[in-house]
Amino acid sequence: MNMIRIWGGGIYEDDYFYELCDRHGIMVWQDFMFACAMYPGDPEFLENVKQEAVDNVIRLRNHPCIALWCGNNEIDAAWRGWGWKREYTQQQQERIFKAYTDVFHRLLPEVIEKYTDGDDYWPSSPMSGPEIGDHEIRPANRGDNHYWGVWHEKHKFEEYEKNIGRFISEHGFQSFPEFETVRQYTLPEDYDIESEIMSAHQRSGIGNLRIREYMGWYYQVPEDFGQMLYMSQVLQARAMRIAMETHRRHMPYCMGSLVWQLNDCWPVASWSTTDYYHNWKAAQYALREACKPVILAPQLTADSLKLWVVNDLPTPLAGTYTLEIKGFDGKLHQTRQGKYKIKANEAAPIAASSIAGLLQDNSHRETMAVITIRQGKKIVDRQNVYFALPKELLLRQPDIQIQISEEQGKKYLTATTDRLACDVMFYLPGVKAVFTDNYKDLLPGHPFRTEIRTPLSKEEIEQQIRCRWVGK
């Protein structure tokens, strides 16, 4: 991940935040603090806006992390298409829009021009261009766009492939926090996502409905409360991984993908990928993998599997790939191998196979592809591909064995399984713990290893460690 957007509905961050971004090479898309509302245009207000903008531009302008100044979040799109104009007469509309243009097309760009050395300014996100009237367009062949077909318009995850923009500056999907976070604001009698307390911590009017709808399309919907929280994160991770891999496959046409949202300001069901207590959700682990400099990005259609490699490195990459067709019990049905070459900063297909040829006589409901790309002996990336929706897979009860070890003061978990277990989440009930990797598919013959950062001793971890998996 190499860019973060400071949203116009939040705050200007403190100096230390930008210093960290400078140090770690994280570009910042900096909104001015305006979002989803029309603002006054009287002289006193405009002077207030000017002084706030000048203060923050002078404070932040020398940070190399600042990649773009953006006037506001979604106001151009909202005034154009959210029905706000219906509340006003034509004369009122003209006065309101003049105030808008005074702030975002005159005042703020003048501040940027005067107080920076040519920094880029974008009036509103999303827009198709920098001029008045350059509204967001579909298909988004210029400017930036916010894609909410998945979620608001109930598009399936597969629709990401049909909705590619040049720079997708906002897209996302909701999930609940993990059970340990939810326990901080609930009692056992509240353990229902529709309970009064849980509803108070779900500020989207369609949030629970959307989660249930999408989960029913892709997974079995659990009745257990804890499993429901967990499965919502698995669902969110699936959406965000598909989105990011799809956007990256379409480089250089698409060269930006920003996920709404990274964090929460209170413990709540939301689109965040880390919760209020900084616990990583499944989506954060998935996005870390999907945002690596070099990734496998398989593209599965009704009749074919195409292997893509995305290389964001400034140097070309060459190596070998292996495609193994396996049963969920680990039995190897066939192996295909080959070589690949990818140019610097390129996304390209390296191989394609028919589904019929891969499956042969094996059931699509209990067969998978394990694809690995290597550079020499080094594994660059590995991906699992399933030939049916998760709810259609024949997932039988796995026997997951867990070992805890301690090496040089660090504690590690190693897990093995006798058959496929999907999206396995390890956790310590009631204990604050950080797992450096989690929510992974466990396969026979492929031990999973992760570091556990917790004050608990090795023996205490052995007694308390638990796990969840899809279908449990």
Where are these regions (language model features)?
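Active-site neighborhood of glycoside hydrolase catalytic domains
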Residues: 23, 39-132, 238, 277-278
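Short, hydrophobic/aromatic beta-strand segments
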Residues: 317-322, 422-428
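Intrinsically disordered, low-complexity Pro/Gly/Ser/Thr-rich segments with frequent PxxP/GP/PP motifs
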Residues: 324-363, 431-458
